[in-house]
A protein has these predicted regions:
Chain B
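Membrane-helix interface/capping residues of multi-pass secondary transporters
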Residues: 33, 153, 195, 222, ...
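Membrane-water interface segments at the C-terminal ends of transmembrane alpha-helices
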Residues: 1-148, 175-196, 228-241, 266-297, ...
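Juxtamembrane inter-helical linkers in multi-pass membrane proteins
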Residues: 158-159, 163-167, 253-262, 299-306
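Short, highly charged, low-complexity non-transmembrane loops/tails of multi-pass membrane proteins
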Residues: 157-160, 428-431, 524-540
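Glycine-rich helix-loop "coupling/hinge" segments at transmembrane-helix boundaries
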Residues: 194-222, 298-304, 465-493, 528-531
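Short helix-to-coil transition segments within interhelical loops
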Residues: 65, 153-177, 421, 427-447, ...
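Membrane-interface capping segments at transmembrane-helix boundaries
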Residues: 150, 245-253, 420-423, 515-527
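Flexible interhelical linker loops that connect adjacent transmembrane helices
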Residues: 243-270
Length: 360, 546
């Protein structure tokens, strides 16, 4: 009985304390100025250590500068979920980190608010980082990467996608991301299509799949950065890889990997503002400040992804810059990803891709 | 007379499969989905067959080791322990184990058992093996409930002159057909929803679950994804229903053997095989977490010795610490929404055996249907009620979603003591106990162990779920499972493996605490008996009373 009484007493005290706490937050400061609570901008990115750095180096300082609080949540690119919450009006985010795919589809579907390019200075951005519905967040490339310790003795390192398809010269498994985007392009480049002709008449998907079929038994598919890193370091001789992951393998894991920007497929990740964001103006202010380059060099140093702000690009040491996709020389070696073409054809290509994977 | 006994369950399975197959086929939208359906069925059959093979024979042998009477219990314990490892970590560790330049793949190539230059980790065989390590515990747990009831029957048949084939056909298989079918159907229905394992291993198998995920995430083709989710359910529900029906039948048919089984010659090695298989994943995970290399490499530990650095990092990592509170809140919400309704329902329907039976069947079906399709369908339903989605806190909504399988678990656990509880309540009532007394002194103490077990079960669901917490709330909840998933996306360091081991140890600790709490009255009685008796004897002046 003694314990029961004590438990009741403790519960009562906790309840009272909770009530008092609630009251405290609501009451006005007597005699002091009326402090208006800060607005909180709500961000969404892909989680993990990247999001931590993005928050620490970019989001928090900019929010401090424009006078708001920030909250960053992780999502795993569940665009269907994001689209559904925007459509039914329950989307909580003001700024979302998305890939080109969602930028184009979401923009066409009325899910995104147009960027006010009068407020956001496009001249501060690297070429290509501007879209009607998004501001570039980072630049990345799908590059040809290889593990130097797995190359046959005396064989020169691969230099183009043609070598990626050369099983005799470079025996061993190859890692490819399990999506048609990027793979169709690299297969066509390997099959002799010139970079400038790649999107000219639309991508020749069947030709690309025929080329990919020549190495199908040797392909190890990856879907996330972790798998790519693991495959390139322990399982595959080469990979079509996100440049940032190769950068990380070299820097953090000391794995003897190398890559080339020759024939790389250059893309951006984007900041977008959902159409029903509660703080569109403030989000726009954030983007206007973002293009000044605050903290983007940290992302470049830690993850190898290129800054989109020209100012940030200037602050990066040359030895690091030459490893980034934003470096003008590297950008020229690659092919810009055509998000528009993909947005129009993705559903059909995706079906054909799955059909090919299923052996037909 | 044997043929009808065999035919009835087989007929039921055939009807369920054919019915589900036709319904699913008609629901599927196009040729790609049909091809994916066939691939899924093939994968399901392969994994099921292997699980049955690797589960039934070794367990049969384990039950026939009089010198190792605890072996079947060890198998059950290891099976339960194996379920503590999150699927993401399991798949990553298997991927490291099967790596092309690793000892396993190299050995296979040297022996010419694997083609030169082709990856092992992303092969169809690797996916099948990974899924077998995932679902073998289910097979062992289901079979271990029924197989002991065989007792000495096969030995008696042998003594009476029946050969091995005759004994198998006339005694063993008819008796074990139902549990075998149940285990097979459960594994099969679970394989229909696999997505993380083929994805992480890098397989080109486009299963139905993978196709749904692609349609949702890549092309945002929600209507088509929904149709495929319905098709998956159309196939899974009849399968799960037949499995539930068999479990129900087996529950009532099960009997203790009159005499334990005789020794099975040469069965020791066979009985240890599942232990080895189930030890592979935790072993690989441990090796990965102890190595110095910052990537998941099996060779690292052997090249440069062990380190506990990754465990330290996992404990100190702000990312992991940040998700502790949300994970705890989601777990508590899931536990509350699982346990209280299950408790209420269990007590309310206690006097009605038919209703109890229906609830049991429903709970089993809920547990066995693929969770990916369930999550997608719940998401679609919830999207129609934006007000509810907006007003309920994210952690609560995520917990409520997890409570769907959690409720099923909790109800089944509580229902296990239903018959005993019913008798005890009737007895208490006869002795004049009031309703309040019956609840406090009879019902709750009887149900307490089940409540504790349900609490642990919800922890397991919370630690591995990324569907309900990501899809149901408008704002995703960052739990330990989603943190692992996010980290896997941006590079998996061995701290991820260490974090998974720590999570498994935490659950083990919970299980141990639950066990001690359950056994506490008995332990106290033993202590009192051992301390009290000499004291009483001394007081009475009786020497050598013990």
């Amino acid at each position: 009985m003694k314990w029961k009484r004590l438990a009741f007493l403790a519960t009562g005290l906790l309840f009272l304390a909770a009530c008092a706490q609630g009251q405290k937050t609501n009451e006005k400061q007597p005699g002091g100025p009326l402090v208006r609570p800060k607005v909180t901008l709500h961000f969404a990115s892909f989680g993990g250590s990247f999001q931590d750095d993005l928050d620490r180096a970019v989001i928090k300082p900019i929010c401090r500068e424009i006078g708001c609080d920030s909250q960053v949540d992780a999502y795993s690119g569940e665009y269907d979920h994001l689209a559904a919450t925007i459509k039914n009006g329950t989307n909580p985010f003001d700024l979302v980190h998305v890939e080109t795919r969602f930028l184009i589809q979401g923009g066409k579907g009325g899910l995104l608010a147009p960027i006010n390019w009068k407020e956001v200075d496009e001249n501060k951005l690297v070429p290509g980082a501007k879209n009607r519905f998004g501001v570039g967040l980072l630049a990345w490339s799908l590059v040809l990467a290889w593990n130097q310790s797995r190359l046959p003795a005396g064989t020169p390192p691969p230099s183009s996608w043609k070598d990626f398809f050369n099983i005799k010269k470079y025996p061993g498994p190859r890692a490819l991301r399990n999506t048609p985007e990027g793979n169709i392009e690299l297969a066509l480049l390997a099959d002799g299509v010139k970079p400038q002709d790649l999107y000219k008449n639309g991508l020749d998907v069947d030709r690309a799949l025929r080329k990919l079929s020549t190495i199908k038994p040797y392909i190890s598919w990856w879907t996330s950065g972790a798998e790519l890193e693991q495959k390139l370091s322990t399982s595959c001789i080469m990979a079509a890889a996100w440049n940032g992951r190769v950068f990380n393998l070299k820097k953090a894991a000391q794995v003897p990997v190398a890559f080339t920007y020759d024939g790389s497929i250059n893309q951006f990740d984007w900041w977008v503002i959902p159409a029903n964001s509660a703080h569109k103006n403030l989000a726009m202010k954030f983007l206007a400040a973002f293009v000044n380059g605050q903290g983007q060099d940290t992302i470049a140093k830690n993850f190898g992804y290129g800054p989109v702000a020209l100012k940030a690009l200037g602050a990066i040491p040359p030895d690091l810059l030459e490893q980034l996709p934003s470096d003008p020389t590297n950008a020229k070696l690659g092919v810009p990803f055509d998000g528009e073409w993909w947005a129009q054809n993705e559903a059909a290509v995706e079906k054909r891709w799955n059909q090919w994977l299923l052996g037909h | 007379m044997r043929i009808p006994r065999l035919a009835s369950p087989l007929l039921l399975i055939a009807l369920a499969l054919i019915g589900g197959w036709i319904a699913a086929w008609l629901l599927l939208p196009d040729e790609v989905a049909h091809l994916s359906f066939l691939v899924t069925i093939k994968l399901g059959i392969e994994v099921t067959a292997l699980c049955l093979l690797l589960g039934s024979f070794p367990l049969y042998a384990a039950l026939r080791q009089p010198k190792w009477p605890k072996l079947p219990h060890v198998l059950v314990a290891v099976s339960l322990g194996s379920l503590l490892i999150p699927t993401i970590a399991r798949s990553l560790s298997l991927s490291a184990l099967f790596s092309f330049y690793g000892p396993l793949a190299t050995g296979l190539r040297v022996m010419r058992l694997w083609p030169q230059g082709q990856p092992l980790d992303s092969s169809h065989a690797a996916v099948v093996i990974a899924l077998v390590t995932l679902y073998l515990p289910f097979t062992l747990l289901i079979l271990s409930e029924s197989m002991p009831s065989l007792g000495r029957m096969p030995d008696v048949a042998g003594t009476l002159g029946a050969g091995v084939l005759q004994t198998s056909l006339r005694v063993t298989i008819p008796r074990l057909l139902r549990p075998l079918a149940t285990a097979g159907l459960v594994v099969f229905s679970q394989v229909l929803g696999v997505i993380i394992t083929p994805r992480i291993l890098g397989s080109e198998d486009v299963t139905l679950a993978v196709l749904i995920d692609d349609l949702l995430k890549r092309t945002m083709n929600t209507p088509e994804a929904l149709r495929i989710a319905w098709a998956e359910m159309a196939l899974a529900i009849p399968v799960a229903a037949v499995a539930a029906y068999f479990i129900e039948k087996e529950r009532t048919a099960r009997a203790r053997p009159l005499q334990p089984a005789l020794r099975f010659r040469g069965g020791r090695v066979l009985s240890v095989i599942p232990l080895v298989i189930l030890a592979v994943v935790p072993g690989a995970l441990l090796i990965l977490s102890l190595g110095h290399s910052p990537i998941l490499s099996m060779a690292s530990l052997f090249q440069s010795g062990p380190t506990l650095e990754w465990f330290r990092r996992a404990l100190l990592e702000p990312g992991f610490r940040r998700v502790l509170l949300p994970s705890f809140m989601v777990w508590m919400a899931a536990a509350a929404f699982s346990i209280f309704p299950a408790l209420l329902v269990s007590v309310l329907i206690l006097p009605y055996p038919q209703v109890r039976r229906s609830f049991r069947l429903l709970a089993l079906v809920l547990l066995f249907v693929p969770q990916n399709a369930l999550g997608v369908l719940l998401f679609m339903v919830l999207s129609r009620f934006p007000a509810a989605q907006a007003s309920i806190p994210a952690w609560l909504l995520g917990g409520m979603g997890q409570a769907v399988p959690g409720f099923a678990f909790a109800f089944l656990l509580m229902d296990r003591v239903g018959d005993r509880l019913r008798r005890s309540l009737a007895l208490a009532s006869t002795l004049g106990a009031s309703a309040w007394q019956r609840l406090l002194k009879v019902a709750l103490p009887n149900l307490a162990p089940s409540v504790a077990a349900a609490f642990v079960a919800t922890a397991l669901i919370t630690l591995d779920d990324i569907i309900f917490v990501r899809y149901l709330p408008r704002l995703p909840v960052n739990t330990a499972a989603t943190e692992l998933f996010g980290r896997a996306r941006y590079g998996a360091a061995p701290d991820l493996a260490a974090a998974c081991i720590l999570m498994a140890l935490f659950i083990l600790l919970l299980v141990a605490c639950g066990h001690i709490a359950r056994e506490f009255p008995a332990i106290r009685r033993r202590l009192v008996a051992s301390v009290g008796r000499p004291k009483v004897a001394a007081e009475l002046g009786v020497e050598g009373a013990r």
